[in-house]
Structure formats: structure tokens, C-alpha cells
Amino acid sequence: MPEIVDTCSLASPASVCRTKHLHLRCSVDFTRRTLTGTAALTVQSQEDNLRSLVLDTKDLTIEKVVINGQEVKYALGERQSYKGSPMEISLPIALSKNQEIVIEISFETSPKSSALQWLTPEQTSGKEHPYLFSQCQAIHCRAILPCQDTPSVKLTYTAEVSVPKELVALMSAIRDGETPDPEDPSRKIYKFIQKVPIPCYLIALVVGALESRQIGPRTLVWSEKEQVEKSAYEFSETESMLKIAEDLGGPYVWGQYDLLVLPPSFPYGGMENPCLTFVTPTLLAGDKSLSNVIAHEISHSWTGNLVTNKTWDHFWLNEGHTVYLERHICGRLFGEKFRHFNALGGWGELQNSVKTFGETHPFTKLVVDLTDIDPDVAYSSVPYEKGFALLFYLEQLLGGPEIFLGFLKAYVEKFSYKSITTDDWKDFLYSYFKDKVDVLNQVDWNAWLYSPGLPPIKPNYDMTLTNACIALSQRWITAKEDDLNSFNATDLKDLSSHQLNEFLAQTLQRAPLPLGHIKRMQEVYNFNAINNSEIRFRWLRLCIQSKWEDAIPLALKMATEQGRMKFTRPLFKDLAAFDKSHDQAVRTYQEHKASMHPVTAMLVGKDLKVD
């Protein structure tokens, strides 16, 4: 079989050598906005007579490379846009197969590192101390330290991080104590250990004025003090979710499961950094209604972090299985009808992505080809929701949830600590269901896996909780001007916040609505007063797409006060598409760009066709 190549990495592939361990020693400089230190990589040759190897780097300054106490020659290659620069290291001795060597690289990051966001004190809740956080997925670890920046290689790590002593450092690892910095009494060194091998996109660091509160036997929630109480309340279901996840996936091997609530510019809903999930503060709805994101990140402890996509072309393996587990966790907590409600909502999100890209766009394929494509640019709900839809369809085809969950647990056990491709997954599916090969052969695999657009088959969904959302949405969509008086606040009295959100999602699919309808909707439902981020996002999109000028400042405010890309990018796009707000949207972006997360700033710039 031909070797799978990771087209997103410039480093030597796993067939040549593998990084087994990283020992990171670094110092965080908030004045210069740099991380300076050494990365000691234990590398194992996978072939005989290995004389040199290549690592990924991006915007790094390399001071020197030392092997066995001796400086060795290295060469930084030409920058290849988003992939960074390959770093070739000459080895002092030729390695034989399985021989290990420790390569110590002294490096410094750039203030513009795409992996890091440096916040001024004014950008924090406490307004007193600066803040730093990393986001390495998919291919930004190379902008922190030289590495084989591919999910096909897994390594353990230890770290020692020096920070100003009034701040706290956390990593995607078990905390291993803190000591005064012997070289600077105004600083402290925090130590970490990660004994489970992980792909380097799961290396994570945060430094800030952080406090914690225990919310479960293996869970602390961390944030600035202003958010700690609210976060502890919002995420109180964490331990019960973990227990259900263990029942579905097998033992939780990571020891601790902490949560970190980041400042508003964090670009994602959550990031499954091991031992320390990162989440957006936009989940703080006050009623635990957005806790499915926690169920999702918990589920990654099995699908993604234990069983990992071998390359980003197979990202759906991480996300489709994780959404499938997430929805089972929520189903166990809130009922099977709720699982189906969320599943159908996900199909709607998939429809939106396919509509946005166009039904023949290659990014709407489940398995993508990222040759010369930045994974950040290809990112969408497709791997999540098309991936989930395939698994949900297979569940129904193969005999129901219990049967398919049996497969999922066996899949996790089979591929734990490994990195795999779609073919590995499919081969195991066929071997697990060897008595149902005829059923599996009914699946149009080429359409599901390799063709663009919506899947060839839509699974069956229980409509119980969705029907009320559709009914109310249809009333608004079909209403004539004379009918608007028939709407009143009691329309919503029996709807949960999840259903209210789905009502808006359904209505948004039919936007624009007549402006009079939107104004009446605000009059009777007072949506402007709702702070639930998912509801507010869809409401403001509906307003802007229906050309309500009064909503422009509200939409601009939401697009800039937080930076979760799920919200910020569509809001900016809608504002730019409305003639009355186009110039203001571009101007607002340009004013905020310097203080935005680097990836968010880049992608919004592309969306708005500026820069």
C-alpha cells in the first residue's frame, strides 16, 4: 500500500523517524511577546542509516541545535506560506533503525506567532495582568517550537515554564508543582507532565491571572476570578458527562479533566486539550443550555485524542465520532428524543455549509484533499455533521444505537494510541460487522466518503421536539402583513432555549423575511434582550439579512466583543453583504484586526476580501 503522506507537514514523515518525547523549557516574555527556550526532542529512527531529518517550524528564530553536547549543523529552508519553513538537521552519527537520539533546539517565537494570542490587561476581565493562550490545531504547533507537526506522530512531554510570579501557567498535561525561578525572583516556574502520547496539535499553554474551583472529583474549572463562580455553575454536569462517556468509550486514561474558560477572543467553542479542555466564555448562558460543547470536548478524550486522524484529510474521523458520542451523552442525560432533535439540528447545519460552499465544492466531501490547502481555510461543520450523519445512518442500518455503540467501543479499544485513516476505519467496520457485510455493501461508500454535496441518504429522525420549531417558523414565513397581529409572547411559552434556537435556525434558512415581520418579532418576543450566544447570533443574522438597519450596531458589537469564529465570521459576512453596513463592517474589522486572534483576523480578512 502506498504510504499516506501528510501534505500539511514539511517534516520528515513517521516512516523516516518519530518524535517520542519532548522536554520543553521556556520563559514567557509579555513585554517582547515571545516564548524563549529549548525543546529537547527524543527522536527514534524508523530506518537504517539516517543521517539527517527535517522538522516543521513557522516564524521561529533558531539559536542553535545541540546533540550529545555538541552543536550540529542545521538549515532553515524557504518559507512556504502557511506551512512555514522546513528545518533540516544534520545528525553527528548515522542512526540505525529504532535508535534514539536527543536533539536540543534553542528557539524563540515571533510576536506574530499564529499559535499564540497575547492579550493586554485591558483585554482581560481583571484589567490588571496580561494573558497568553495557545491554539495549535491544526498546524500551528510549529509556530511555538520545532516539531514533526503531523497527527501521525505521537509523543509524551514534560515542561518547565517560567512566568511572572503573580500569574499562573497551565498546560495540556498534569500539573507537577511550581518553584521560584532561580534566575529571577520576580518569576515562578511551573512544571508539567503528559505521560500519554499525543499528537503535537494537542500541546497547549495558557498564562494569566487564573483561579480555580473544584466542580468534581477529577475536575477543576479555571478562569479569571470574575468568571469562576459562573463557570462552576454552568459546567456542573461535567462529572456526570465523564461517567457516561466512560461507559460508552472505556476508561478515561488522562487522570485529570479540567476546564479552562478563556477570554472572549478564543476562536473556537472548545478545544480538547488533554487534561485541560479550553472553552469559549460564550458558553456561559446562565442555564447550562450550551453544555453540549462540554460533552463534545469530553468525548474527544477517546475519539481524537486516543484514536487520532493520521492526516487532516481524515479530520472527520476525529469530529464525526466525537459528535456521535456527544449526542449519546446528551441523550443519556436528557432523553433519546433530545438526541434526535440535536441530530436533526446538525443536518440543518450541514445543509447550511453545503449551501455556503456550493454543492460541488471539494470542501463538502467527507474525506478532503488538503494538498496546498490551509486546514484553517477548509474548516467547517462538514467533517462534524456529514461525519455524524454517516455514523447515525450506519447505526440505523446495522440495528440501532446499542449495536453501533458496541462497535464504537471496540473501535476505540482497537486504535487507541494510534493514528488512522478512513480505510483503517472502514476495514475495521467490515471486520466487526462481518455477519452484516451484505448490509454494509448497500452503503454508497463513494458518495458518502468522496463525493461533494449532501449525503446520498438522509437518516430518519424523531421529530417530536423539532415539530413545534418548524410550525412556528412556518407561521412567520407564510404570514401576510395582516397576520402579524396573531403573534404574541405566548407563542414561546412551551419552547426550551434549544427549541427557540432551532426556531431561529429554521427561519434563518428562509431569510430574508419582510422587514415588518422582523420588527414585529422583536416587538412580541424581545429577542434583543436574550444573551444566549447561539440564539442572539441567529437572531442578529436574521435581522441583518432582512436589512434591519437598527440591528447593525448590535451585530457589529457581537462580532467584535467575542471572537468565536462560528459567530464572528458569519456576522461580518452578513454585515459586509448589506449595503448599509458594508463600509462600517470593513472599517470595524480594520480597527479591531490588531487585537484579534491571528487566525480569526486572517479568515475574516479573507471573508471580507480585504488585505
Curated annotation (Swiss-Prot):
It catalyses: leukotriene A4 + H2O = leukotriene B4; (5S,6S)-epoxy-(18R)-hydroxy-(7E,9E,11Z,14Z,16E)-eicosapentaenoate + H2O = resolvin E1; (5S,6S)-epoxy-(18S)-hydroxy-(7E,9E,11Z,14Z,16E)-eicosapentaenoate + H2O = 18S-resolvin E1; Release of the N-terminal residue from a tripeptide. Changing D376E: Strongly reduced aminopeptidase activity. Abolishes epoxide hydrolase activity. NCBIfam families: leuko_A4_hydro. It is found in: Cytoplasm. Pathway: Lipid metabolism; leukotriene B4 biosynthesis. Zn(2+) binds at H296, H300, E319. Its main location: cytoplasm. Changing E297K: Loss of epoxide hydrolase and aminopeptidase activities. One of its GO terms (cellular component) is ficolin-1-rich granule lumen. PROSITE patterns: ZINC_PROTEASE (PS00142). A peptide binds at Q135, C136, Q137, P267, Y268, G269, G270, M271, E272, R564, M565, K566. The active site is at E297, Y384. Isoform 1 and isoform 2 are expressed in monocytes, lymphocytes, neutrophils, reticulocytes, platelets and fibroblasts. The record marks E272, G563 as: Pro-Gly-Pro binding. Bifunctional zinc metalloenzyme that comprises both epoxide hydrolase (EH) and aminopeptidase activities. Acts as an epoxide hydrolase to catalyze the conversion of LTA4 to the pro-inflammatory mediator leukotriene B4 (LTB4). Also has aminopeptidase activity, with high affinity for N-terminal arginines of various synthetic tripeptides. The modification N6-acetyllysine is found at K73, K337, K414, K573. The record marks D376 as: Essential for epoxide hydrolase activity, but not for aminopeptidase activity. This is Leukotriene A-4 hydrolase. Changing G269A: No loss of activity. Belongs to the peptidase M1 family. Inhibited by bestatin. The epoxide hydrolase activity is restrained by suicide inactivation that involves binding of LTA4 to Tyr-379. 4-(4-benzylphenyl)thiazol-2-amine (ARM1) selectively inhibits the epoxide hydrolase activity.
